[in-house]
Amino acid sequence: MLNLFILLLERVGLIILLAYILMNINHFKTMMSERDKWRSKFQLIIIFGIFSMISNFTGIEIENGHIVSGDIYYHLSKDASMANTRVLTIGVSGLIGGPWVAIIVGIISGLCRLYIGGADAYTYLISSIVIAIISGYFGHQTIKQNTYPSIKKGAIIGAITEIIQMGCILLFTNNLHHAITLVSFIALPMIIINSLGTAIFLTIILSTIKQEEQMRAVQTHDVLQLANETLPYFRSGLNEKSAQQAAEIILKLMQVSAVAITNKKDILTHIGAGSDHHVARKEIITDLSKEVIQSGKLKVAHTREGIGCHHPNCPLEGAIVVPLYIHNEVAGTLKFYFTDNNIISTSDQQLAKGLANIFSSQLELGQAEMQGQLLKDAEIKSLQAQVNPHFFFNAINTISALVRIDSEKARRLLIQLSQFFRSNLNGARNNTITLQKELQQVAAYLSLEQARYPNRFNIHYRIDDQCQDALIPPFIIQILVENSIKHAFKNRKKNNHIDVDVSMKQDYLSISVQDNGQGIPADQLDTIGYTTVTSTTGTGNALVNLNKRLTGLFGTTSALNIQSSQSGTTVSCLIPYKSSKEEHFNESVNR
């Protein structure tokens, strides 16, 4: 009996070893967390079906109360029986997967045992199904509660299921004397082994789940700590200063060799190993980062070639690169670099992904705050324009001069002046206005400018009829037209033309303002609309403000597009088309 116990212990060890290997595979861990889904049940049937066949074919032949052999068996003689771990695999399949998994595994195991043959082989098919129903019942209770049986409960169920098998052998046998001899020899070792094996199997599962929970807790703590310390920086936007401050904190708190943050084009910061050639303010040099920006998906590299850095002395051997999003559009990347590619773990990847999600949310919140601030700035500038001494007195002086010459025209200009002030104030208080109202604002502004400088410039409109009700951010066209008048023509007093073109391009509204002025110097063209410039006629801050509002509201696809030559300048943008009629309809429905 002791020999049988040791041989059975070896068989259980094989099953436990396979279980341990499976529980260290991520796919199996995911499957175990989704046991109530049929996809997972089907996979559990396959796995435990294979386990049950291994248990059958690695059994120990028993004849007349003695061990004959422990070899792998395909067929037994008619008087021989077998001691194996079949009940263990059926019982555990039921405790983990529930009744349907256990019943199908039980049928597979029973048919396999029937195929091997021996004395009363059909008995084992019956016992397999009975054991499956009982273990499946207990498993179903725990699946409903999203838990697992305790180790103690599993051990008791394991012993009970083996006792049931012994009962089936005695109940359904054709040779009671043979059955009693067999049960008296194998019962105690198999009951102990089955109980012990079930307990160990559940211990592996429960300990793995506990480790996963502890790892998640540590990851959550790390993510929250990092998020808490980097929170103030990403709220200010994705720029060089905020990126460097955040990267310094990440490098200090994480076990990585280097941290880098980029936008879609340039490296904003790189701190740690490889900083001699991964330099801020330069274009992205790694192929891996470009792939992430293109695909919008997390990428992991375990070799220098996978990173795609072409510097011959680059010390970086591994990397995790995660995209940063703003309003569902890739805005940049967060990169963790390693000089030892063997230490890149799944937890590092999950941590990087979690941080990227939090940083993306902070960037979106920061941008929303920036939009609110920009709108406030626009309102302040609008109010300032109303009391601006130069603009106000120039307009009043022009009207005063016209009162004696052409009182009717002076009256019309006063109306236009009041219209201009009113439109400025109303526009600053709204995120969008109709194109029609924007054009009225432009007309009011131009009438005052043309009164001061008669015949100095001509303006032409090409507006699609279907665009009149389109909603656009206020001051777009006015700022572009005003920019042309102030900067395009210098001291030229005639043959100055401005063309305003508004049309539909698929689902976008295309707005273009073109002049035939002197053009923008080539050294300033790339910075116009992004940074202020030094000029005797202004700083270009209005275009910077406008560009920020456009990209903040609609994304980078709506950024200002500036083309210039010696024959003139064209400033254009694309805005997602939305009709004021549609908005009014939606508001009326929601009331």
Swiss-Prot record:
It comes from Staphylococcus epidermidis (strain ATCC 35984 / DSM 28319 / BCRC 17069 / CCUG 31568 / BM 3577 / RP62A). GO terms for biological process: cell wall organization. This is Sensor protein LytS. It is an enzyme of class 2 (transferase). Disulfide bonds: none annotated. Member of the two-component regulatory system LytR/LytS that probably regulates genes involved in cell wall metabolism. It catalyses: ATP + protein L-histidine = ADP + protein N-phospho-L-histidine. Keywords: ATP-binding, Cell membrane, Kinase, Membrane, Nucleotide-binding, Phosphoprotein, Transferase, Transmembrane, Transmembrane helix, Two-component regulatory system. Its EC number is 2.7.13.3. The keyword Lipid metabolism does not apply. The keyword Cell membrane applies. The modification Phosphohistidine is found at H390. One of its GO terms (molecular function) is ATP binding. The gene is lytS. The chain crosses the membrane at residues 4-26, 45-67, 87-109, 122-139, 154-176, 183-205. It is found in: Cell membrane. Residues 363-579 form the Histidine kinase domain. One of its GO terms (cellular component) is plasma membrane. It is a multi-pass membrane protein.
